[in-house]
Curated annotation (Swiss-Prot):
Annotated localization: Nucleus
Record field: compositional bias (Polar residues): 333-370, 431-454
Name of the featured protein: B-cell lymphoma 6 protein homolog
Gene Ontology cellular component annotations, sorted alphabetically: nucleoplasm; nucleus
Gene that this sequence comes from: BCL6
Stretches the record annotates as Disordered: 303-371, 431-470
Species of provenance: Gallus gallus (Chicken)
Superkingdom per UniProt: Eukaryota
Protein task: Transcriptional repressor mainly required for germinal center (GC) formation and antibody affinity maturation which has different mechanisms of action specific to the lineage and biological functions. Forms complexes with different corepressors and histone deacetylases to repress the transcriptional expression of different subsets of target genes. Represses its target genes by binding directly to the DNA sequence 5'-TTCCTAGAA-3' (BCL6-binding site) or indirectly by repressing the transcriptional activity of transcription factors.
BTB domain boundaries: 32-99
Amino acid sequence: MASPADSCIQFTRHASDVLLNLNRLRSRDILTDVVIIVNREQFRAHKTVLMACSGLFYSIFTDQLKCNLNVINLDPEINPEGFCILLDFMYTSRLNLRENNIMAVMATALYLQMEHVVDTCRRFVKSSEAEMVSAVKTPREEFLAGRMLNHPEVMAYRGRDVSENSMPLQNGSLCNGRAFAPGLFNSLPGSSISYPGYSPLPLNGFLVDDELREMRMPLSELSRVSAFPKERIPCDGSRTIPAEYMRTITDISANMCHATIYSPKEGAAEEARSDMHYSVASGPKPVVPSIRNNPYFSCDKVAKEEERTSSEDEISQHFEPTNTPLDRKGLISPQSPQKSDCQPNSPTESSSSKNARISQNSNSLFTKSPTDPKACNWKKYKFIVLNSLNQSTKQDSADQNEMGTLSPRTYMPMSTCQQSMEPEHLNVQSPTKMSVNGEDSNIPQASRLNNIVNRSRDGSPRSSEGQSPLYMHSSKCSSCGCQSPQHTEMCLHTSGSAFGEEMGETQSEYSDSSCENGAFFCNECDCRFSEEASLKRHSLQVHSDKPYKCDRCQASFRYKGNLASHKTVHTGEKPYRCNICGAQFNRPANLKTHTRIHSGEKPYKCETCGARFVQVAHLRAHVLIHTGEKPYPCEICGTRFRHLQTLKSHLRIHTGEKPYHCEKCNLHFRHKSQLRLHLRQKHGAITNTKVQYRISANEVPPELPKAC
């Protein structure tokens, strides 16, 4: 093991604690260095946080002429509520989305160039308005480069266009073009410096007229020309551009961030100084998606009800993309925050987990039922996801039992070799405890062997449709003649037997048998075996559910490996170590669960609210919140609890047990949280890595403590 000087310790909660402390500094107006004005409302923040979360603020504060600004006026028609929600998201990583503010938040996120928030808003719209998804299916690149995202001052050019200094702008196809924004940011009143910069967004959504008949047309008029481009042009140059194409531009903001209104006179003067063909907005327009003009956000419920059933498939096929979306990485300018390490990626909850990425990129969100048994993990989701299927399955099984038949799915043969064929035995449950809903909650190894026998019998010619499923009881082992269906798979003479060496070692209490003429008989079911090892395997699998017992706590296990893993609890051995933080565990499964803390993976999802969890046990506990079930009652006072651990903690009130001990002052506590609070208050100990500021709003500390 490495020495403490060579080890690297990672605090998993450090990032969230720093963000929490920054939010508290903002709420107390400590070290805030910029004021954002949105529609006469002021928001104080830190420049570092703003530029780390927003591409717009990154482009502003990285410029040497603009980095010292202390007051920034955004577009007056930007919704202050949407900006407030995004500002809180920057400091808390929690996005408060509701149906009444989703459009404002999305428009503001587009304005601030927070693409991961835009993607989240789009998924929120798809989940809440399922009919919108079937109306228009737009690829991500086309949506981001479409009508709502482009800068107000758009220059449409071709390869032969030349700027003022006779330098060619760009040679290539139109799909590789970029928008040029001469007025991306205007400084405060008193500063007349114009800041030219390239937009990081491609213009693959614009199709320019080859004769440039509309180059001088105002953007407000161009937005009424057409709702969609007539045809998309592939970037490979294999197709020729027709003579006439219409371009679609919506009413967008005249300035990305400004203190003074950009007037048409200034635009005319700017146009007169340049030979390039670009259009100037006639006035300030908000970066708000137009509900009427944008069919993606069309919310006319009357029209949707009339057209939803008839033309749903036609619309989805009509707007299907004809070519592969462009790679926008090659079009990003040097000033784009996406080429900097400070540009934020998507939140960990939505990008790190492979399950989350699959759900985000998949278009079959509503085509597959969340309760599809094939999509569920039977061992982990059987109690949570299949609750709705249990009732219907039980009802079907009850109907079959009334007819005197056994379902092939629910059938399980008895463990004895000689089973009576009387009708009363047909409905007797076997020791395997196979439930009628298909759940294998308490199935021993013998039951799994029976399933193998069932599958092999179904494929044999002797198993016909009219044959009773109890046929296998009359089958005999070809090697030793035993009639037990379990023995057929366990006998060493049978070909294809795949039992490990550890299954041959059993305790003496399961080997009670009688030996006669070299043959071994089982005293439980009178099965005959040629070797003693076969008899031991038979006793282990058929007549014992959990033969391996711990000699310290009497815990029993089905497999020897589980017993060996259990003994590490008593010995304190933790051979499995995390390579990132050095934490050690006694089981590999615990190490696997721990590594999800570092990777951010949350594979278990609640089908009701969409919350994700690291462990399936956390998901099971969370599901009880929706069902309202409290299955754990206190036998003394009758109080019911949702979780078993809460009940165990409650029982200490009645028993008086105080298992948590303070080594410094010899005090005992009933709960672990009480001991932690005592250590913090009385002994000044830091019980975890979460450091919080304990100062009043009016008090400004001379030096901030360091977060661990």
